[in-house]
Curated annotation (Swiss-Prot):
Residues 1285-1308 form a propeptide. The lineage of its organism: Eukaryota, Fungi, Dikarya, Ascomycota, Saccharomycotina. It is found in: Secreted, Cell wall; Membrane. Residues 487-506 are annotated as: Disordered. It is a lipid-anchor; GPI-anchor. This is Cell wall protein IFF5. Keywords: Cell wall, Glycoprotein, GPI-anchor, Lipoprotein, Membrane, Secreted, Signal, Virulence. The keyword Secreted applies.
Amino acid sequence: MKLFQNILISIALLTQLIFAIEIAENKVDRGSITLNLGDIIIYTGATWSIIDNAYTNFVGKLDVRADAGLYITSTSHLLALQVSLTTILHSITNNGIISFDSRISRTSSSYDLRGISFTNNGEMYFGSSGESSSSTSLTSASWSNTGLLSFFQNQRTSGTVNLGVSMGSITNDGQICLNNQVYEQTTQIKGSGCFTAKGDSTIYIANVVLAVSSKQNFYLTDKGSSMIVQAVSTTQTFNVYGFGDGNKIGLTLPLVGTIFNSAFTYDTASGILTLRNTLLEQKFNIGTGYEPSKFQVVTDSGSGTPSTVLGSVAYYGHVPTRTLPKSCQIPCKPIPKAPGTQPTEYTTTITKTNTAGNTVTETGVVNISTDKAGSWFTTTSIFPTLTTAIAAPTSTAMSTDLSSSVNIPVETSSNESSSITLASSESSAVQTSSIEIPVSSHISANQESSSIGESSVNGSTMISSESALESASEFTIAQSSDVESYSSSEHSITHESSAITSSSTTIETHVTESSVVVDSFTSDSLFVSETQDPKASSFSIVTPSDSIIVNESSIPELSTSVGAVSTSTSSSEISSNSYFPSETHISKVSSSAEPTFVTPSESIIINISEPAVSTDSVQPSTEPQPDMSSVIAESLISSTVSASEIELSSTMELSHSESLLAKQSETINQSESNYISETSAVPTAKSTISDSKLTSTWESSSLVNMESTYSVVISESEITPIPVHTSESATESAAESSDIQTQFTSTWTATKSDGSFVTESGVISQSGTSFTTIATFPPLYTSSDITTEFISTWTATNSDGSVTTEIGVVSQSGTSLTTIATFPPSSTESGITSEFISTWTTTSSDGSVATKSGVVIQSGTSLTTIATFPPMSTSSDIITEFTSTWTTTNSDGSITTESGIVSQSGTSLTTLTIFEPVTSLAVPSYTVIETEFTSTWTTTKSDGSIVTGSGIVSQSGTSLTTLSTFAPSSSSSEIAPEFTSTWEIGSSNESNVVESSIVNQSNESLTNSVSSYEPATESAIVSPSDQVLTSSATSFVSASEFSAVTTTTVDSASASSSTDINNDVTVLVSPSESEINTSSSIWNNENNVSGAVSTSESTSIANNHDGSLSMTKTESEINGFYSTESSTMFVTATITSCNKSDCFENVVTYVSNDSYTTVTTGHSNDNTSVDNNNVPSTLIENVSNTETIPVVTNTEEVSTTVYNPLTSTSTSNIVESSNTSIVDNENNGVHINSDDMTAMVTAVETGNGITNGTNFVSPSTIPNEISETGSPATSIVGTLPYENGSNQLSIENIKYLILVVFGLMMIM
């Protein structure tokens, strides 16, 4: 025997281990899940977040370890959480965080945790909405709390919190927080813990016979909290803290004194407050320092507790200072935010094998969000993959012999070969050229332009970069992919020339026939250069107004060997003997791992990072050696020379180098009226866009204008633009250095008026320090057409680290920004005159301050206003209406938040409508679900009368918007609203079809009106006519998403030609998730040869005080034989439909006498049963509590019993049956009337048996909306709710229960 018991126990433990769920890392589940048999263990450092699983039933022990978490959350307004652990053999142990949060749901939630033991050493949170009565029970036999238990409701209802098994005991050494909750004590309370009442909460000691420890503490935190104790002869003393400011302490009986004692007394020495009902009294240790004159007898009428008239005492004074016990000092924390309840996104990498067998790695962004209905969905965006390919090289021989009016002798020897690679996301174009440049030539560089496509490359090394958009939370970051370049192993160029010109560029370049690119300058002077593809510097740009900067850096470290340069000049000519050898190569490329985020205010910020350069002197010289950051230019040129042709090819993106801004400073040694300047060339660019990649080619030349004997030093370390000066003595006006123009693609973010972020991309042209958006790529959605102009200031960081502030006019159209003009920097020279747009403030004669804008001319330091722009609007004639929320201070000093419709005319605001205050529904901060619902509000007219209006209101967070307003209601019955409805028709000879049409609602009846909808499917519409339901052949397309929904079920029973069978109709109306308009049922008896039985029915719907809706139906025969009346409620249920082992769930709102929340239906034609006269009835598989309608044979008289839960059972005669009877019982038809739950029997042949049209009663309270009508036979199904949305015990559960019961029997 002992051995057998041990075997059973071992099998039970093994079963738990097999089905156990162990969580060792963070996990998020959304939607319905089923917890099988077994324990649940969440290990340290892991969390499990279950979202929108309405029914959660733990069937094993629950163990949450330290620093672990279990979160069960509902984000649905319709379905609240139902969490249970109902087995008595398992325990609950929490050392981490357990949170059950259903605050957003508008239905009642239920938390029922039992088990053999309950131990909480961590934090547990239980949240409900409070719109309807919710229940919370932690009723384990062994109960202990040393941590935090928090019970929260948005508003107080009659629901209560129960702790421990009734008549048992609990041990509380921690903190128990109540917020808008009622704790009802039914056990002994041991320990030295604390009960804290916040908001509208009450601590109700319902059974004083069960002792409460003298070390237990009760803390009332504000004026809405209270404590009520049962008035019995057993007197106890309760430690109460925080009593005062109007909160209450009372008994369950009115406070009545005796001739010896008053109704209450306060001992100022001991601090004991005694409350009495004659001989019954209870004592409260509230502490000392209270003034007896401020005590007052009041009534505590909170819901969920006994409301005793004048049974409580309030103290209308401040709470005297008193030290709280340690347990009451544990803070009552808010309910934590569950992981996964907010829309989120993250980057993921996917590795897979393609068809060629190669491993391909893809990167993308996974976005998890919700739609308007609150349903979760996932979107994955994969970044394009960078692919490269190198083809076989080709050889090309090229020779150049150019001449111009100014000849520069050049001794050149070059042997250059390089490979060109263009990498794109889909294809690659490769060209390799071997270029031979003649030894001697006369070169004159002229500006040209060329275009580089993806299949043709002119030049040497081509750099391809790919732009990847990584989306993260409301903004977009442009990140640059790695740059790949391919060049020949030997790359050497030798040039001899007599001039050095300066060109500023730090992006990847390649060599043309007449120039050499070395780092950030191009030289055709006398020096030897060997170069290898320098990488580009980086920049970042932020457009005005709340944008995000991405700073990326890819900085090559360059080592350069620089020779000596000697120059001699005179006043009449320039002579030079310059030798400037240079050897440059990339020694290291460093790249920052993370982008930097900066948020400026209405500024454009440009950060330029220059390559790190190290120099090495290789030859001595009597002249000072130049720093690598400076280049001596134009040492042998005495006339206008065109030189230094540059061709640039690159794929531009946000990290494009801004060295092409050419913000160079000119150090000018000026003598008398002569001066020298350098004009940087204006590059021409041609771009092609392919696969989100912009490939551009620039060609430019530098034009050097000179008239003097002085040298010009172009210092790249001083990037400070200066304005162009005009001199009459100059032979040719020199343009300022900022004339260099470049084009590149950029991505920026803009903040819309509603606070959302919009990411845009486009082509930006830059001339000097001026930015112009040439083209904006089309956004994914239509942006705003509003165009505004404003003045913005931005800063530019020079190569030497200095910061330059610039200002200009920026135009904004929607989310597109364009720089219209850049203001020149201020100058002390009085001859410089500039015009710009500015904004200023003026003080009117009445002292008010007005803001104006206009065109301002600046001459030196003098400012003159040329023109003033008109104001944005003449204001007063522009009238707009919008929904707004504001706060109002009442006469008692309290602050009330109100919402309504506000009209604005100019700067004047007028409140048109104030919305009705909404019941307290605290929506968590993480909720971003938009909802639409029907609401009613009041409006005060000009004559002071109040008009009630209704309409559809859209809510996004705490913002309310009125979508439409319903026509005013009228007492006249002729006014019948119309709405689009959809219903389902099922019959015995065809499958269910769905139809929609315009339904007219008058009082509580629904009729179809003529519709112009286009026919979509072939079906039937039911219309009443002379107590007989007929069908017409027409159909309609579906209605809009805001339409109410009407579901109609129609069944046609089997009938012969001699019998007129009517359809059996049930109508269900559910317009939205928060409102129900009406529900009614239509049923008519048949006309048969033995007589007609007709019924009439009236339905009324009432709005109850608690906000729920109920429907009262009255049904009677036409001839008045019987009359029934029943009152039903609108109930929300989850329907699980099963076909054998396949089940699916559906949530409906229906009318029922009982508040069923879980209903299961099924159908099978395999099994039949025969009762009495062999009328077949269907047995439904896998459905519990199935009932078959018996058919009784009576040759003389047939009676029916009308079942009504509100009235007594009665019997009435229906019809005589002397002429017709049943012969062929196999062809009989039976179907169920969904209104009064009676069975309609139809006979098709005559004989001895039962009469046509007989009603048989089913003693069932199953909701009529979900009962099924079958053919040729049907049975009524009654179900009982079960955990996790199922009404059946699985085979595994049955086996397990049998095993446990059998084991217990053996032990006993």
